Amino acid sequence: MGSGLGTYIPLALYLAVLASSLRALFGKSDLALYILLFLIPLQTTRYRLEGFFLGSEIIDILWLSIFVGLMLRQGTSAFPKSPIYPYLIALSLLTYFSLWMGSFYLGTDLPIRLSDTRFSDWKNYMVMPMIAIVVAGAVRTKVEMTRVLMVVLASTAVVNWSFFRSTNGRDFSHFSYDLRDAGVIGYAGVNGFAAFIALIVVFFATLLFCYKPKVFRLTLLVLLGFSVYCLLFAFSRGAYFATLAGLSFVAVFCQKKLLIGIAALVICWQLVLPQAVQERINMTYGGSDNTLEPSAADRVTLWEDAMNLYKTNPVLGTGYDTYQFMHRVAEYGDTHNYYVKVMVETGTVGLITLVTLLLRMAFLGLQLYFKADDSFLKGIGLGFCGLMVCALVANCFGDRWTYLQVDGFIWVLLGCVMRGSELAKRPETTREADGIAEDEVARMARNSFSEAGTCLTT
């Protein structure tokens, strides 16, 4: 029998959000930042706060309070210079213009109210680049960057635990759709959950390869072990492929021996993978005539229909966030390929804008890897680039780009890369004055879990 304390947890969390947000307005952003990062993938946890005043807007309250606090105390100097800003501005302007186009295309109300579903979707999409900017402004040193990563690790551990708890007692000896569960990721679905885990595996595996402090590496090994388990039994073929693509890219730069292991897995997967996972992979083609199984065949139908629609508006598309309201193929509201969706809704211009942004983000991480002279920043840079390769592939199988709980950490890590790129340019003496020596970071790795827990309960 439970203690009954669980009923007070949402209230305690809500009060912590309010207190930390008020504190952030006066320039003390650490608590608000940690709570913001911790809650990003925990969609069902955030849902429990919606009964409180502005409870559905806690993510906005947190990032806005941090942003306003930084601007009041330091102005624009709080944020590092970065070549990524023009690309983010281009994305926001294009999608907002396309949002209005979509209203005329659908014949609906103009997107000027938060109660409008399409405007709300666009606003939630734009929150993610703002989170990157907020992280880049609030995180000033390598030690603070380590704290951010440890909160990300702690939040991921909760995501993994929710999967274990939800699937406890289920028989994984053979595949069944009933085995699949999204845990706290919520409405992004099990494929969104799998994509989230894939991104985590690629990034932290890279950091494990590059960064040597034993305590930090042990923490990563434990998390990666649980994450790989979750990835396997999420039964997402797209996530499997995206993970292999990201790890293969990383292996070329820092762990070429890993390529041998990946090649062996590709060749011998029927010998080493669990039976249920093998059955899921083999389902792609089924039946005596070796035709596509129903879900894969439905995707092909969706893509063909979407491409026909794209041809009617090839330059600017039908408008941002319009496809889900058309119901052109059965009950589906998504093309199950994000690039196809972008082509349909924002046309060739939108696709070029998106792909250019994705590649520029990946290149920013790769630049940090080559320019940094310490293993920690190198690991963050290469890990982020590998993560972007994983994301590029994952979005071929559905929308893994506009859900905060799925790819919110991409933007958090982009903020770290933006700040890391500035740190890498400083003279060695300046960076030492910032307190980023290797032994200090190792000490922070030992203490960050307890500090994050204290911050979240203060």
Residue ranges and their predicted role:
Residues 67-68, 260-265, 382-392, 399-451, ...:
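Transmembrane alpha-helices of multi-pass inner-membrane enzymes
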Residues 219, 264, 346-392, 422:
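Hydrophobic transmembrane alpha-helices and their immediate junctions
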Residues 51, 235-238, 333-334, 398-408:
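Membrane-interface catalytic loops of GT-C/OST-like multi-pass glycosylation enzymes that act
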Residues 73-80, 137-147, 210-216, 419-439:
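Membrane-interface junctions at the ends of membrane-embedded or membrane-associated helices
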Residues 8-17, 42, 55-72, 122-130, ...:
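Membrane-embedded alpha-helical segments of multi-pass membrane proteins
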Residues 172-173, 184, 275-277, 282-348, ...:
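Long extracytoplasmic/lumenal interhelical loops at the membrane interface
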Residues 24-50, 55-126:
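N-terminal hydrophobic segments of proteins, predominantly signal-anchor/transmembrane helices
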Residues 3, 16-24, 92-96, 100, ...:
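Alpha-helical transmembrane segments of multi-pass inner-membrane proteins
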